[in-house]
């Protein structure tokens, strides 16, 4: 039996979802009456289709009359046999059309041979009623489908929540069904003005959502029948464009193919490869429309599902349970779509400053002595290192919250030494808890058993699987008692070993046996009538039984939330244990994950293909509100090469989360392992990242408080330029920096797209003033682009980074840790537009405290340049950041040599001007938290 918690549980923001629906004939919300031929089968046809007593699953309530209107174009067909292959006779028994079609070139799946006719019976819209927040209606079905346990009467609630957000649910009014326990906004009145209009088809039921601005149809569910059976829900819609992204996690291009593509969402432990379900599930997509417009759609459903894309273009959601809970975001531009999505699922957490430094790990640092030596080697080679990690090696028998007294006997002292050196420490923590020891020998299991925190099997006993420590039980993080138990375990272990963050792995959850060591029951949860395209051919492949019981529901419903709920528990536990900003990196994710944790992209291979694929992966997770994301630099599986590792380090310097990690028995790949030439190239990339950390930290602040992205695709900034829509091997940091990495072997040039505007090579900024880099070789210092592809020089020691005209970025002298770099002098790079304008921002606090915004313990500055004058605007100043010392202002785009430079009305005599690069370098001695004015003439 499912155990339902009271509505007051902290995660149950949707426990009592707001219920409203759209009705026609009011304002712009017109109820369309569809033509007679589209209304479905007549009662006579229904009677002829299925005589009383018919029991065949192909006939159960389904019309047998030969369908008409089967002359649909192949790309506009919607599959009438999603569950299995069927014969022409079985297809017609379902009331569908059968017509063979060729497999399209380069398609992942074929066009359906058995497909719905336009007249296929669906639901009918009835009892339309106006409510305070929108409208409500009843949906009734007269003819059952070919799936068991159809729900014949449904309730439609539609909420016009905001100007740009429309929300509707379809659910069973008679029986409570599982709903995702994600806290979402509540509204109590209808938005007075909207960017959308809504129309309805009465029979067959359908919803059409249009953008008022141009009348474009964004959502049209009339293209295929609605299914709502107990274990099969299908909602299809047309798409206004083939340019669609989202629906993570998958390995591939940022833009999805609409050429018959199926994306499966069921979190799975598997090394990333194309066309398989990976570690996370994010049922959200964003569509780019003509004219720079965009919209997004979010299906708040955590059950196993397929999402099918077809060339018409159209999309079909196929879920195995829950309800249909749909949000539509009107933008109107892509940036706003992302922010509106994050308004629903939550803005990202603010990471500690040190978390943006370099992290180093590998599976195989088998002793504390080896771990110490790695840190020492990094220091001797003059490579920055902020956070040292350990994999399973530190554990006693690979059990959580223990350490090996033989190989890590001085583990607590080692961590203290890292702290004394200005560094931090993170270790792996898997969710599975060893269950095989004698009672009283392993406190996490003993306490968990006593407190009832584990997922249970059909007998009510803890489900036992097998993971790294052997036999294991799995904590149920939807149980409030489990959150408290996890907090206790984390706090107790932290009292022994003062770690600084948690790396939560294997949390799909991963299991080395199918389901459990005792197998799984033979029931409809284990063998659903519709099985999405999961790797392994069963829901229990590499995980636990779908029918196992959790506090909120069955694992069948909650599987995709496991990583999210563990991230929340770990986030909360770290706050309790440390009293400072938590740092959690998780492998498994779901919508809203960025509120609690970052993500790394899993067990990637050390090859050029996976290096290249990491760029769209980083971009996609930023669109999904998980900006703290990165891939294992140099690759995890297999052996890297020197050139690959150099290029990966250069790109990795621009991952929001920068970590080098590799597998047991792989060749070592720490930066100091390579030739001096390679080391110097890597050192330049490290230096560049550390110099730019103030800008990166400011971007994370903006993501945290405004729902912005950190790393972002070009189309987010330039949506009106269609050439940017498919660019996914370059990335932007915020609005200002364009990174064009080398992603292929043996290349000394790289071609990138430069949107319209002026772009300054960042190497023309005199960072040698920091004493860290030699002056750059002569380069093409500025690109005046009309929107074009540009081939750039990219020798092995170079990653191309360009600063966009109109922007100002803060920089700081580098060091081997952020503890030291935060003490260095600041600099500002000012990139002028043709009209001589630019602006930028700096956010600064102590880098790790909680509640700095509420307490006012931060400094926020706005920088403005106009009319040959540069000023700082003091938005908020506190002791944190007020005393930062500014030593250099570099102005790019100064066309003529200045005769005079003034700083606070005092002449600056030692400024320099380079006519070749149009660069004005102004040495200053200023305090950032005090008003200043710099001018040149």
Curated annotation (Swiss-Prot):
Disulfide bonds join 70-97, 80-96, 91-114, 520-545, 634-645. Residues 1-23 form the signal peptide. Glycans are attached at residues 127, 220, 259, 377, 457, 639, 867, 888, 910. This is Lysosomal alpha-glucosidase. The active site is at residues 505, 508. Residues 24-60 form a propeptide. The gene is GAA. Essential for the degradation of glycogen in lysosomes. Has highest activity on alpha-1,4-linked glycosidic linkages, but can also hydrolyze alpha-1,6-linked glucans. Gene3D superfamilies: Glycosidases, glycosyl hydrolase (family 31), Golgi alpha-mannosidase II, Spasmolytic Protein, domain 1. Keywords: Disulfide bond, Glycoprotein, Glycosidase, Hydrolase, Lysosome, Membrane, Signal. GO terms for cellular component: lysosomal membrane. Belongs to the glycosyl hydrolase 31 family. It comes from the Eukaryota. It comes from Bos taurus. It is found in: Lysosome; Lysosome membrane. One of its GO terms (molecular function) is alpha-1,4-glucosidase activity. It holds the Pfam family Glyco_hydro_31_2nd. It is linked to Defects in GAA are the cause of generalized glycogenosis. It is characterized by a accumulation of glycogen within lysosomes. This disease has been reported in Brahman and Shorthorn breeds. Its most common clinical representation is a failure to thrive, progressive muscular weakness and an un-coordinated gait. GO terms for biological process: glycogen catabolic process; lysosome organization. It catalyses: Hydrolysis of terminal, non-reducing (1->4)-linked alpha-D-glucose residues with release of alpha-D-glucose. CDD domains: GH31_MGAM_SI_GAA, GH31_N, Trefoil. InterPro entries: Gal_mutarotase_sf_dom, Glyco_hydro_31_AS, Glyco_hydro_31_C, Glyco_hydro_31_CS, Glyco_hydro_31_N_dom, Glyco_hydro_31_TIM, Glyco_hydro_b, Glycoside_hydrolase_SF. Its EC number is 3.2.1.20. Residues 68-118 form the P-type domain. Substrate binds at residues 391, 587, 603, 661. The lineage of its organism: Eukaryota, Metazoa, Chordata, Craniata, Vertebrata.
